[in-house]
């Protein structure tokens, strides 16, 4: 069994370089919610150093609130903003001798695209226009995955080690009870359940089906590095290989 481990980088966390030695894919902030040209370049260099797949992490234009503000923008505006961000990272990666291989939206752009078909289509069209070989990462079973498939893109269905799930398979919104899993033991159990058995226990106590092709590890968590190491060790015991596939 093979699974991808991804982490969001270039967002001002001190753990980036250490975390890159434990994951297989990096989602690099492209300046709209965090990061700038220098952090993008450094993140790309580290990813190349450790053999980690380079991906863009585009966002709504919302640096003040770290890309977590709900926005209702015209589809063509989102399309242009995503193309702009992907183009920037693709150019930096190419200049450093690498190549961008995937795209994972950030924050509220990601969450809204999971349930809003028009927004999801705008993102998928932008990805295809920049490079139709790019992989599109989205919440497992979401509208973004469907949009990517409709556009003929390779998709990667994502699950979260440290987030609570609602009965419909979407994430519990940040700020609500149960949104974040702070226990490493519970996060590990949830991750293994999703990877092994393709299901997750929701806050209501029911099971929701999920396809775990890539697992997100948040680098800004209280015990992010410790958990990442523990997860890699447990995967090895379980015979689960980590690769960007």
UniProtKB/Swiss-Prot annotation:
One Pfam family cited in the UniProt record for this chain: LamB_YcsF
EC numbers: 3.5.2.9
Species whose genome carries this gene: Serratia proteamaculans (strain 568)
Gene Ontology biological-process annotations: carbohydrate metabolic process
Family per similarity comment: Belongs to the LamB/PxpA family.
Underlying gene: pxpA
Catalytic activity: 5-oxo-L-proline + ATP + 2 H2O = L-glutamate + ADP + phosphate + H(+)
MF (Gene Ontology): 5-oxoprolinase (ATP-hydrolyzing) activity; ATP binding
Known partners and oligomeric status: Forms a complex composed of PxpA, PxpB and PxpC.
Alphabetic keyword roster: ATP-binding, Hydrolase, Nucleotide-binding
Family annotation (HAMAP family): PxpA
Name this protein carries in UniProt: 5-oxoprolinase subunit A
Function statement: Catalyzes the cleavage of 5-oxoproline to form L-glutamate coupled to the hydrolysis of ATP to ADP and inorganic phosphate.
Gene3D superfamilies named among the record's database cross-references: Glycoside hydrolase/deacetylase
Annotated InterPro entries: Glyco_hydro/deAcase_b/a-brl, LamB/YcsF/PxpA-like
Superkingdom, taxonomy of origin: Bacteria
Signal peptide from the UniProt entry: none
């Amino acid at each position: 069994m093979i699974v991808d481990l991804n982490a969001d980088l270039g967002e001002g966390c001190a753990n980036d370089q250490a975390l890159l030695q434990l994951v297989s894919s990096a989602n690099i902030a492209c300046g709209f919610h965090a990061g700038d040209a220098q952090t993008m370049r450094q993140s790309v260099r580290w990813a190349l150093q450790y053999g980690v797949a380079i991906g863009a992490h585009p966002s709504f234009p919302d640096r003040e609130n770290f890309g977590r503000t709900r926005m209702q923008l015209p589809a063509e505006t989102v399309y242009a903003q995503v193309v702009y961000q992907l183009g920037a990272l693709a150019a930096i990666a190419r200049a450093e001798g690498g190549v961008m291989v995937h795209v994972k939206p950030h924050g509220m752009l990601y969450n809204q695209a999971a349930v809003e078909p028009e927004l999801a289509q705008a993102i998928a069209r932008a990805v295809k226009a920049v490079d139709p070989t790019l992989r599109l990462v989205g919440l497992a079973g979401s509208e973004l995955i469907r949009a990517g498939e409709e556009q003929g893109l390779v998709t990667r269905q994502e699950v979260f080690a440290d987030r609570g799930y609602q009965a419909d398979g979407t994430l519990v919104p940040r700020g609500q009870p149960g949104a974040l899993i702070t226990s490493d033991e519970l996060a590990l159990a949830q991750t293994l359940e999703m990877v092994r058995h393709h299901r997750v226990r929701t806050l209501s106590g029911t099971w929701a089906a999920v396809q775990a092709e890539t697992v997100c590890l948040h680098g800004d968590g209280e015990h992010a590095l410790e958990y990442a190491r523990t997860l890699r060790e447990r995967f090895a015991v379980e015979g689960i290989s980590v690769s960007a596939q």
